Curated annotation (Swiss-Prot):
This is ATP synthase subunit b. GO terms for molecular function: proton-transporting ATP synthase activity, rotational mechanism; proton-transporting ATPase activity, rotational mechanism. The lineage of its organism: Bacteria, Bacillati, Bacillota, Bacilli, Bacillales. It is found in: Cell membrane. One of its GO terms (cellular component) is plasma membrane. The gene is atpF. Keywords: ATP synthesis, Cell membrane, CF(0), Hydrogen ion transport, Ion transport, Membrane, Transmembrane, Transmembrane helix, Transport. Belongs to the ATPase B chain family. It is a single-pass membrane protein. It comes from the Bacteria. CDD domains: ATP-synt_Fo_b. The chain crosses the membrane at residues 15-35. It comes from Geobacillus kaustophilus (strain HTA426).
Length: 177
């Protein structure tokens, strides 16, 4: 049957002999074997290396993307914490300022009250001194009048003159201060 096929092929090929076909077929098989041994395997190795390289690049890109997302999330969390800390600092500063304001106002009120009390005491002391001085003057004038009355007996009109003179002396003494 092989010969018949070769003969038919030979006839169909218009002058190509069966030996040539077998020779070409044998050469083609040898070429395939050589290509498989020397070219196919290195070509497949290169394709496999390229495939591995691309897969590695994809894996690395995915890892970098995940790391970038992780870093982005960390940065967002840090920003959130920073904002919260800043808000807390502002709130603490506001509270501290309010407390200091209240302390300053309370201190100023206490100082004003102290100054007021000191002024009241000073006024009271000066009033007491003025009253004591006035009592001394009244006492000395009373003694003086009594001694003058005793020295001479005065008429009612003389007594009035004496009292008016005494009042005038007191007014002059009070006005001289």
């Amino acid at each position: 049957m092989w010969k018949a096929n070769v003969w038919v092929l030979g006839e169909a090929a218009h002058g190509i002999s069966g030996g040539t076909i077998i020779y070409q077929l044998l050469m083609f098989i040898i070429l395939l074997a050589l290509l498989r041994k020397f070219a196919w395997q290195p070509l497949m190795n290169i394709m496999k290396q390229r495939e591995e390289h691309i897969a590695n690049e994809i894996d690395q890109a995915e890892k970098r993307r995940q790391e970038a997302e992780k870093l982005l999330e960390e940065q967002r969390e840090l920003m959130k914490q920073s904002r919260q800390e800043a808000q807390a600092l502002i709130e603490n500063a506001r509270k501290l300022a309010e407390e200091q304001k209240e302390q300053i106002v309370a201190s100023a009120r206490a100082e004003a009250e102290r100054v007021k009390e000191v002024a009241k005491k000073e006024i009271e002391r000066e009033k007491e001194q003025a009253m004591a001085a006035l009592r001394e003057q009244v006492a000395s004038l009373s003694v003086l009048i009594a001694s003058k009355v005793i020295e001479k007996e005065l008429t009612e009109q003389d007594q009035r003159k004496l009292i008016e003179a005494y009042i005038k002396d007191v007014q002059e003494a009070g006005g001289a201060r």
